[in-house]
Amino acid sequence: MRAELAHANTPAIVRAWISQPPQWLEVVSLKQPVDSALAHLEAGEREAISLASELQAILLLMDERDGVTIARHRGLKVVGTLAALDLAAAHGLVELQTMFERLRATTFRSPVRLMVSMLEQDAERKKRQEG
């Protein structure tokens, strides 16, 4: 996965981030070979699903539709990037608007109306917390 983030086709902002990752990021290698049944997926998804299974992870962060379907079929709990950011925003760890702006600087794509709806819900949540 690290190689995918550092690839020349990856946006510069992402390559810069992975070149000096935050201290909380732990890079873990697979102990077993990648499951050959996942060969039709991209390398990052194959490795993520295999590692999540190997580690018996409680949660897998993944957005690629085919990978999500297979991971869930294998009993893994999967959350997408937007849901993870929304959860972090709900706990006051990030500012959702800022995170969405940063995502737009990458190759990440999501329906604009979904992101607008999430920002509206975030604003409502903040009002409830204030008042």
Q: Residue locations for each model-derived region?
A:
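Short hydrophobic/aromatic-enriched beta-strand-loop microsegments
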Residues: L76-D86
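Alpha-helix N-cap/helix-start capping motif
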Residues: E64-R65, L82
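Active-site-proximal, substrate-binding regions of enzyme catalytic domains
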Residues: M1-L59, R65-K77, T98, R102-R104, ...
